Amino acid sequence: MHITTLDIPGLFLITPTPRADVRGVFQKTFDAALFATHGMNTDLHEVFETESHKEVIRGMHFQMPPHACAKYVSVKHGSILDVVLDIRMNSPTFGKHLSIQLSAENQSTLYIPEGFAHGFKALTELAHTSYLQTAGFNAACDAGIHFDSFGMDWGVDNPIMSERDKALPAFTSFISPFSHQE
């Protein structure tokens, strides 16, 4: 397993090391002890899965405190452009975003800590995405930021989106409850 530190502190790309033989493939995709040495929260509470069609955009979502959560995002079928936005006040990367392709082929997982908004665009006809979360869903703390309000070029003119996501507030009007901690 290989862990890559990404350009925004706190984000990690986790890539398994598959071992193949005549039976097929075996690989480790989660290692709580190893992840904890990198400061990742490994106290998992819920797993969600989505199936999305090409040019669907979901996001940008997060949960507010006291039910904020970290996520481990991976793709089981197809491919997505995964996007994260730093919404931690006083962070040197506050307001910066990062995008990375996750796919069934590369088998990578993106670790997203608390204090980030998350979304993605489906790149294939069908993308099956899995989220492991460190807190249970809480409707009262469910929040988001409008997908095109922070400078991300999504590369699609008419994305397929939920009415909820279309109505999310702009990043410029968002007052973050998250703070950066060294």
Regions found by a protein language model. Give the residues of each.
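Non-catalytic, conserved peripheral segments adjacent to functional cores
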Residues: 1-105, 124-126, 136-182
